[in-house]
Amino acid sequence: MMENYKHTTVLLDEAVNGLNIRPDGIYIDGTFGRGGHSRLILSQLGEEGRLLAIDRDPQAIAVAKTIDDPRFSIIHGPFSALGEYVAERDLIGKIDGILLDLGVSSPQLDDAERGFSFMRDGPLDMRMDPTRGQSAAEWLQTAEEADIAWVLKTYGEERFAKRIARAIVERNREQPMTRTKELAEVVAVATPVKDKFKHPATRTFQAVRIWVNSELEEIEQALKSSLNVLAPGGRLSIISFHSLEDRIVKRFMRENSRGPQVPAGLPMTEEQLKKLGGRQLRALGKLMPGEEEVAENPRARSSVLRIAERTNA
């Protein structure tokens, strides 16, 4: 079934170019998806190069297993655990680049059975790994109204969060929702002011998906681990699709691109300054898709690519 879904990789060349591939380097594709980035990385690696790919979606793992290449290996799990995967392979401090393509993929959105989209009726699931954790339906049926409202406000930036949360709880009390269409209809009715350019359920579906998959915590943990696993000169190449993701990536790169914060006039010896350490990253800027790419793939419109390099500090 998954073969029916065409996936166009956003900022493909730019993200891989951002890694500054060395033929004998060791790289991580933390979000394999349908393998667009991985295949391009492999095409630039020599015989001694290695690529470790990660994904928690069983369908992505099935696609990855069709790649018959001794330089390539796939791990079924969350990219937040990349530090553990690298340590298990005795590669701490030896990784030359990490690529992350954040958020939900087009095949996940387009497959109604995954439950990510309000445009297609399917089971109210939304899990990137359907074998683990609570589905969206299970969480919405058991969560408190205040908790649902908080999630909608925090992860969906939904201004009618309280009103929608109340409607969800009332509907589940009458008859538990199990379908995406049911949730979309409840949200539409509960939303007093409609945006003519956006479906009223857009923010709710984003928020519930982020919560169910712990997406922002996943990003924060992966970024934290990256400093430990990257070799000096190793690159981070990260694509975000909405402001919540990009804010985390931008803040991480900014904070780790600064040197030690020492109050002006505080007397310190050279030895003391060395112990404080220097900046750990050098931010190399950001890129956004061009008009041609957006025209071919409208989902690329909100994407942002940020690149940074590990320093010797």
Curated annotation (Swiss-Prot):
The keyword Cytoplasm applies. Pfam families: Methyltransf_5. The keyword S-adenosyl-L-methionine applies. It comes from the Bacteria. S-adenosyl-L-methionine binds at G35, G36, H37, D55, F79, D101, Q108. Its EC number is 2.1.1.199. It is an enzyme of class 2 (transferase). GO terms for cellular component: cytoplasm. GO terms for molecular function: rRNA (cytosine-N4-)-methyltransferase activity. It is found in: Cytoplasm. Keywords: Cytoplasm, Methyltransferase, rRNA processing, S-adenosyl-L-methionine, Transferase. It catalyses: cytidine(1402) in 16S rRNA + S-adenosyl-L-methionine = N(4)-methylcytidine(1402) in 16S rRNA + S-adenosyl-L-homocysteine + H(+). Its main location: cytoplasm. InterPro entries: RsmH, SAM-dep_MeTrfase_MraW_recog, SAM-dependent_MTases_sf. One of its GO terms (biological process) is rRNA base methylation. Specifically methylates the N4 position of cytidine in position 1402 (C1402) of 16S rRNA. Belongs to the methyltransferase superfamily. RsmH family. This is Ribosomal RNA small subunit methyltransferase H. It comes from Shigella sonnei (strain Ss046). The gene is rsmH.
